[in-house]
Amino acid sequence: MTTISKNKTSNSKGKTTTLGTILKPLNSKYGKVLPGWGTAGIMLIFMTLFAIFLTIILEIYNSSVILDIK
């Protein structure tokens, strides 16, 4: 037996978290275009960190040393 809800709106506001509070300023700028490079610098940093992470995983998988730092 199925239950049909007549009220389609939700009354709960949701949970407020620390991470949500920290990220809220980023969401408030949604849809706006930043002048110049915008957030390309942040994206470059995260892409570089991700590439380093993948290199470390590849080193572990191959049991070799790609970056020999001495």
Swiss-Prot record:
One GO BP annotation here? protein stabilization
- What's any one GO cellular component for it? chloroplast thylakoid membrane
* Stored Pfam families: PsbH (PF00737)
Q: Which residues cross the membrane?
A: 40-60
Q: Name one GO molecular function term.
A: phosphate ion binding
- Keywords, alphabetical: Chloroplast, Membrane, Photosynthesis, Photosystem II, Plastid, Thylakoid, Transmembrane, Transmembrane helix
Membrane topology of this protein: Single-pass membrane protein
SUPFAM superfamilies from the xrefs?
Answer: Photosystem II 10 kDa phosphoprotein PsbH (SSF161025)
**Protein's cellular compartments:** Plastid, Chloroplast thylakoid membrane
Q: Which domain of life is it from?
A: Eukaryota
Return the PANTHER family for the record. Answer: PHOTOSYSTEM II REACTION CENTER PROTEIN H
Q: How does it assemble?
A: PSII is composed of 1 copy each of membrane proteins PsbA, PsbB, PsbC, PsbD, PsbE, PsbF, PsbH, PsbI, PsbJ, PsbK, PsbL, PsbM, PsbT, PsbY, PsbZ, Psb30/Ycf12, at least 3 peripheral proteins of the oxygen-evolving complex and a large number of cofactors. It forms dimeric complexes.
Matching entries from HAMAP family are given as:
PSII_PsbH (MF_00752)
What family does this chain come from, according to its entry?
Belongs to the PsbH family.
What is known about what this protein does? Answer: One of the components of the core complex of photosystem II (PSII), required for its stability and/or assembly. PSII is a light-driven water:plastoquinone oxidoreductase that uses light energy to abstract electrons from H(2)O, generating O(2) and a proton gradient subsequently used for ATP formation. It consists of a core antenna complex that captures photons, and an electron transfer chain that converts photonic excitation into a charge separation.
Report the protein name in the record.
Answer: Photosystem II reaction center protein H
Q: Which organism is it from?
A: Euglena gracilis
Q: What is the lineage of its organism?
A: Eukaryota, Discoba, Euglenozoa, Euglenida, Spirocuta
* Gene, per the UniProt record: psbH
